[in-house]
């Protein structure tokens, strides 16, 4: 797997050879985060903790099944990123807690992940974004796992679980996608 510190800048993630090799979707997604200037100083942890429903990283990280390490003076806990957001600009963080780390499981063989952002201008505020993860069963050439996660469509990132379930067990082709 991979652990990304909460203070890691967007630009560091975008330019990391290790992340590009193992989690290419994150490098590609980071290119769409605001401007280069913002990516140079903005952090992944700050982005997630702001809980902005139009945030770029959350859909891809949720599709990848990311977990968050949260620390306080009482100890630490790890939660799925999907359970981190409560409402517009609201998280499950308690007043004495901080996010310290994003944890990603090891990449799964025969899996592809893509991130797409639709906005009115390049590097502009998006209308909607989505990240799709699909794992293929190479023996049957059918979908074994699918996750479709969107932002800017609800107060928190939306995991379209029913959409993912529709793909499982089916051969992925143009007809199914339509």
Label the model's feature ranges.
Residues 1-178:
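C-terminal structural segment of proteins
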